[in-house]
Each structure stands twice: as structure tokens, then as C-alpha cells.
Design a protein with these regions (language model features):
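Short functional hotspots at interaction and active-site rims
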Residues: 1-195
Length: 195
């Protein structure tokens, strides 16, 4: 595993011919209709009170991609990430957006089985985009991970309690990731932008 991480670092630092500006990291996160803030404030001497839902909840999966300038394309679905779901995301959302805005992008994914499915690889090969897989167990090398933390904080703030409200809230939560945030996430994960 150490050798795989070192090889990835060497390739991603430009030695292997990949400029950090070209990297687009793909990942997914699950959000629930029960998301609520973890901390609260109230006037001194009073207890902070808020309702926090328990019991029935619904999961929504958000698939997204992050480039050095921000979110490139995202989609939310009421399903776990499977090969058909990921294929649909690539085909309908991400690849058309990248063709329009970032034709030289290099897609980077973790090792989720849906990312390695033969139909997904066939689609990526046919698209003409280069793609790479992160070394196993390396979320620290994926800048979209801290991005998901910011998205979930925004969703907690909005407290969407229905699936429709959660889908609607995902858009503004994703746009909360600014270009400055994205650049910081890239730096945090060790990717430097060229001068």
C-alpha cells in the first residue's frame, strides 16, 4: 500500500505528466432526512433546544466531481451507488459537462466496485478522458472528501426533512463550495497548482 501511495504521489505531482489543474475527483456521499446540527447556542443560562428527528429516515446519495476550481457536476438519487447509477451519472451529467468545459480532464476515483465495473470502464474508455484510481484506503488523497463535509454542514443547517426538500437543498449546498474552498481542499490533500 505504501508503494501504491508513493507511485500515486509521483504521478499526481506532475512527474508522471498529470497537472493538478487537470484532476477531477469523483466520489459520492450519503445524506439522510434526519440530518441535524450537532451543536447549538442559546442565551446564557438557557438551554439550547431544537427538534431532532428520530425513527424513519430516507437516504439520498449525492454523486459529485470536484476540480481545482470547484464542483464540476453533481446528481442526487434515492439509491445506493451501483454500477448502473454511476454509469447514468457519468453519461448524463459529468461527461457532457467535462466535454463542454474541461476536455483535458483526468478523472480520479476511489476503488468502489461501481467505479471499476466493466460497463463504467467501457464508457470511460469510449469518452476519451483519461482516468485513474486512487490507491486503496486513501481518502486523504481525495480533495472532495472535505468538500462533502462542507456540503453536509450546509444540509444540516437547512434541516430538510423530506426527500424532495433534501434533493432541492443539495443544489445550494454544493454551490457553497467556492473556488477558494476547492483550491484549499487540493492543497490540504497535497496537490499543488502550477504557477
Amino acid at each position: 500500500m505504501v508503494a501504491a501511495r508513493l507511485a500515486w504521489r509521483t504521478e499526481a505531482d506532475g512527474v508522471g505528466g498529470i497537472n493538478a489543474e487537470r484532476l477531477v475527483f469523483l466520489d459520492e456521499c450519503g445524506v439522510l432526512t434526519t440530518l441535524s446540527r450537532l451543536h447549538g447556542r442559546s442565551p446564557r443560562g438557557t438551554r439550547a433546544c431544537a427538534s431532532a428527528p428520530f425513527g424513519h429516515w430516507t437516504r439520498v446519495t449525492v454523486l459529485g466531481a470536484l476540480g481545482a476550481a470547484g464542483i464540476v457536476g453533481a446528481m442526487s438519487v434515492e439509491a445506493a451507488t451501483s454500477a448502473p447509477v454511476f454509469h447514468a451519472y457519468l453519461d448524463a451529467v459529468l461527461l457532457p459537462e467535462l466535454r463542454r468545459t474541461r476536455p483535458d480532464a483526468v478523472l480520479v476515483m476511489d476503488n468502489l466496485p461501481a467505479h471499476r465495473a466493466s460497463r463504467v470502464r467501457a464508457l470511460l474508455d469510449a469518452s476519451g478522458f483519461a482516468y485513474r484510481y486512487l490507491p486503496a484506503y486513501s481518502p486523504d488523497l481525495n480533495p472532495i472528501e472535505p468538500g462533502w463535509a462542507k456540503v453536509k454542514a450546509e444540509l444540516r443547517r437547512g434541516a430538510a426533512r423530506t426527500v424532495d426538500a433534501l434533493h432541492t437543498a443539495c443544489g445550494p449546498a454544493l454551490t457553497a463550495i467556492t473556488a477558494q474552498d476547492a483550491a484549499g481542499f487540493f492543497r490540504h490533500c497535497g496537490y499543488s497548482r502550477p504557477n
